[in-house]
Amino acid sequence: MAGRARSGLLLLLLGLLALQSSCLAFRSPLSVFKRFKETTRSFSNECLGTIGPVTPLDASDFALDIRMPGVTPKESDTYFCMSMRLPVDEEAFVIDFKPRASMDTVHHMLLFGCNMPSSTGSYWFCDEGTCTDKANILYAWARNAPPTRLPKGVGFRVGGETGSKYFVLQVHYGDISAFRDNHKDCSGVSVHLTRVPQPLIAGMYLMMSVDTVIPPGEKVVNADISCQYKMYPMHVFAYRVHTHHLGKVVSGYRVRNGQWTLIGRQNPQLPQAFYPVEHPVDVTFGDILAARCVFTGEGRTEATHIGGTSSDEMCNLYIMYYMEAKYALSFMTCTKNVAPDMFRTIPAEANIPIPVKPDMVMMHGHHKEAENKEKSALMQQPKQGEEEVLEQGDFYSLLSKLLGEREDVHVHKYNPTEKTESGSDLVAEIANVVQKKDLGRSDAREGAEHEEWGNAILVRDRIHRFHQLESTLRPAESRAFSFQQPGEGPWEPEPSGDFHVEEELDWPGVYLLPGQVSGVALDSKNNLVIFHRGDHVWDGNSFDSKFVYQQRGLGPIEEDTILVIDPNNAEILQSSGKNLFYLPHGLSIDTDGNYWVTDVALHQVFKLDPHSKEGPLLILGRSMQPGSDQNHFCQPTDVAVEPSTGAVFVSDGYCNSRIVQFSPSGKFVTQWGEESSGSSPRPGQFSVPHSLALVPHLDQLCVADRENGRIQCFKTDTKEFVREIKHASFGRNVFAISYIPGFLFAVNGKPYFGDQEPVQGFVMNFSSGEIIDVFKPVRKHFDMPHDIVASEDGTVYIGDAHTNTVWKFTLTEKMEHRSVKKAGIEVQEIKEAEAVVEPKVENKPTSSELQKMQEKQKLSTEPGSGVSVVLITTLLVIPVLVLLAIVMFIRWKKSRAFGDHDRKLESSSGRVLGRFRGKGSGGLNLGNFFASRKGYSRKGFDRVSTEGSDQEKDEDDGTESEEEYSAPLPKPAPSS
């Protein structure tokens, strides 16, 4: 009965709360404060049915709904703030955020943690400030931006003696047309908290310029920030950029041993949420953190300074990280530039704007006091408080004094009357921006030589319009560069002597002589699959001027066009594809073993089950009908299928110059690309996109842009252009590409008359783009190498459409690499290249030892190696037998020397071998013998020190956890 009474009382109290607060109005201890002016409320559907802000999840976890208490903005670009006290006094940890907002009504939201809000009202205009003491940004959400998720085991520390006591929510209402019905809005954030201590603590590292001056009319001004990191290791997982209207692009890097690794790069005019880094970046003692903001002073009549008003500018990069709990710091700052000369080598991407869709552009403004100022009016110098260079470690003081606790409180209005320039001017402008060579210079006067950029919003609109590319809100992946032009940068060093690919001269497959070989691929068993044209030939009579196939009367190819070949002896294991194709072209195989092929005569894409005779599983395009809409292709060239999502990408093709994406079921999703024009094609322009290669762990799709002689890579989810790889040695054509972890293989075409570049294969370090090897066949020669495929052991196959030949190439010296494993994901990379940051590997063999092991395995498993397994076994057994004889002789001599003539020689193999294993006290302990030698330990191989990464647990440490995270102690600071 007592329990029922308590339950009834609780329901009654909750009902009263719902009626009184109307919309999650949690009457915290702040309820005694004066309330914001408000009238009788009528609530939107979103506000109905809520019973309170605190929801228990289990004994230790609870959810906190932090929402606006039913507000109706009256003007566009209204910023409302509200606060909520942490419902517990003890220490807690924020482990997840869930936005509760509609894109139709809310432009963006920020959630701060502090000890005292700026206002005592239930909500207030944010121009009054956010907090009176300290403010730390915990979360940011923006329309069209990706969500921010905390990694498992990571949490923000709140409450207790040192954590924040209040949450302050800031909501920006952009376009208020959705409020024509005067409904109430309860947008906000649901915060998941736990009382369970987290092993990793999240924090914020703020990089901020405090002394940048932007001269009026200056075309390009760089604000550079750099600090040496001298703390315990931190691991970056998200970032956020912030400037006002003059900002073009903000980029952040970790610099280690002169190598620039991208943390994040974003357009500050995009919604300023936290964006996840493509791959976690670790920062350790001695690394340098560097950031650059690119501004323009065009349109200003006087110098622009760093400050808190809309007439001022800001250069902020927020880096969200986590650290091991016992070493964790909740905030760090950098406001200096300790290495200005270092920025001479900053990647060129740092000065190149990122295109955005017009509806994604951020609305900016700071402080209502600037709303009535004319944009061309004289700009006041910042106040003394704004100019003060504060202590580097005082993050909250920086926010309070420099930003006035009002960062991101915007009042700039979008001006629809701004006019664009002509299209021809724009084309030249974009081309110059992309092709300009001295983008990496930090000097503002040198940067002024760049092409004019104009208004940031208009430039991005134009780039979108001319490129026809899907814009992205996500940053480029962690890498050391974006793209270079021929002859620039460290692109073509001498090929490394440690890595060389040569033709396997005893492979008989070179004499198969099928028809024109158009495609090659490898199945799950590493069998070679060939797609060829039989007795059909693609020549000048095959198509008319409208790309309609003219030799339909020949009928389909009457022989099997798909051959499965044994990779060792080149025997045909299986064949199919009879009476189905006219002019085969591209071939790829998905993770389920299905074949994806294209036919340029049929203008179609086929999905085939190699073990079924029921016909194609899926057909895309219309037979013999070229076209450029969602249902037609025009001579499609290749297909790539994303392993995790099943997304289908088609390069289309000889006469469409686009990439088309379909769902796994064949439904059109999107397309991007356009025909290139002029001698300097822009990113996203193609002249025969001929071959595709997926880079799954980076979510990239690389395209062999054949007639432009280059390789372009794009994000598979956003279609953002990531990088271009182009070398003078490519010549005018790149026919085909293939990717294996860490490496990109390519083959070019025959040189034009007067050109010197030979037709050959290339091996490139995917991280840096540099060529590390070139190769050619010995038997026969390349004439039109049409497709290439590589296996993860470095075996390469190339098919030639003119010589009707397939070559097999292998590594003459095993590439030295390391195998890095984290959470079941293995990444192989060149030892000298820092491609993707991975945790430190322990109890792994060194790369040289691993190389020897792999070579032994290869010798014992490859029939074509010419080394007999019997011979190897004999060579291994003989030394063992000799050693056994020696030991037995020594034992016999020892027995005689001590007069033990009656002792029988131990003939038991168990006892003899036992002493070999070190189990007998007087025996020969080979384990101790080898353990005493340099480079060995009793625990096995010494750990490979994988620079800049976590440490993984020993295989036999007996713990149940998958990893053992141990942050190493920092090195002592230099005496100087």
From Swiss-Prot:
Its main location: membrane. Zn(2+) binds at H585, H690, H786. It catalyses: a [peptide]-C-terminal glycine + 2 L-ascorbate + O2 = a [peptide]-C-terminal (2S)-2-hydroxyglycine + 2 monodehydro-L-ascorbate radical + H2O; a [peptide]-C-terminal (2S)-2-hydroxyglycine = a [peptide]-C-terminal amide + glyoxylate; N-dodecanoylglycine + 2 L-ascorbate + O2 = N-dodecanoyl-(2S)-hydroxyglycine + 2 monodehydro-L-ascorbate radical + H2O; N-dodecanoyl-(2S)-hydroxyglycine = dodecanamide + glyoxylate. The keyword Ligase does not apply. Residues 26-35 form a propeptide. Changing M314I: Abolished peptidylglycine alpha-hydroxylating monooxygenase activity. Its cofactor is Zn(2+); Cu(2+). It comes from the Eukaryota. Residues 36-866 are intragranular. SUPFAM superfamilies: Calcium-dependent phosphotriesterase, PHM/PNGase F. Keywords: Calcium, Cleavage on pair of basic residues, Copper, Cytoplasmic vesicle, Disulfide bond, Glycoprotein, Lipid metabolism, Lyase, Membrane, Metal-binding, Monooxygenase, Multifunctional enzyme, Oxidoreductase, Phosphoprotein, Repeat, Secreted, Signal, Sulfation, Transmembrane, Transmembrane helix, Vitamin C, Zinc. The keyword Protein biosynthesis does not apply. Ca(2+) binds at V520, L587, D787. Changing Q272 to E/A: Induces a fully open peptidylglycine monooxygenase structure with Cu(2+) distances of 14 Angstroms. It is a single-pass membrane protein. Residues 1-25 form the signal peptide. Residues 498-820 are annotated as: Peptidyl-alpha-hydroxyglycine alpha-amidating lyase. GO terms for biological process: fatty acid primary amide biosynthetic process; heart development; lactation; limb development; long-chain fatty acid metabolic process; maternal process involved in female pregnancy; mitotic chromosome condensation; ovulation cycle process. One of its GO terms (molecular function) is chromatin binding. Disulfide bonds join C47-C186, C81-C126, C114-C131, C227-C334, C293-C315, C634-C655, C702-C713. Residues 928-945 are annotated as: Interaction with RASSF9. Changing R533Q: Abolishes peptidyl-alpha-hydroxyglycine alpha-amidating lyase activity. Changing R706Q: Reduces peptidyl-alpha-hydroxyglycine alpha-amidating lyase activity. This is Peptidylglycine alpha-amidating monooxygenase. It comes from Rattus norvegicus. The gene is Pam.
